[in-house]
From Swiss-Prot:
Gene Ontology biological-process entries: translation
GO molecular function, one term: structural constituent of ribosome
One of the Pfam families matching this protein, by short name: Ribosomal_L33
NCBIfam families: PRK00504.1, PRK00595.1, rpmG_bact
Family classification: Belongs to the bacterial ribosomal protein bL33 family.
Protein name listed in UniProt: Large ribosomal subunit protein bL33
Source domain of life: Bacteria
Lineage of the species this protein comes from: Bacteria, Pseudomonadati, Bacteroidota, Bacteroidia, Bacteroidales
Originating species: Parabacteroides distasonis (strain ATCC 8503 / DSM 20701 / CIP 104284 / JCM 5825 / NCTC 11152)
Coiled-coil residue windows: none
Length: 62
């Protein structure tokens, strides 16, 4: 039997960088998908952080 190929689209978690440094309780995380072939580097997106009430940089975590 042939093996099932892994898909190119994978699920990734984005975590706020400013919130981690601020020391406030809680965390801001988003789950999204990316195409493994087109985007080989880690994602960095500006997303809304409801705790800090502003747009902040969210980076992909393992």
């Amino acid at each position: 039997m042939a093996k099932k190929a892994k898909g190119n689209r994978v699920q990734v978690i984005l975590e706020c960088t400013e919130h981690k440094e601020s020391g406030m309780p809680g965390m801001s995380r988003y789950i999204t998908t990316k195409n493994r072939k087109n985007t080989t580097q880690r994602l960095e997106l500006m997303k809304y952080n409801p705790v800090l009430k502003k747009m902040t940089l969210h980076k992909e975590i393992k």
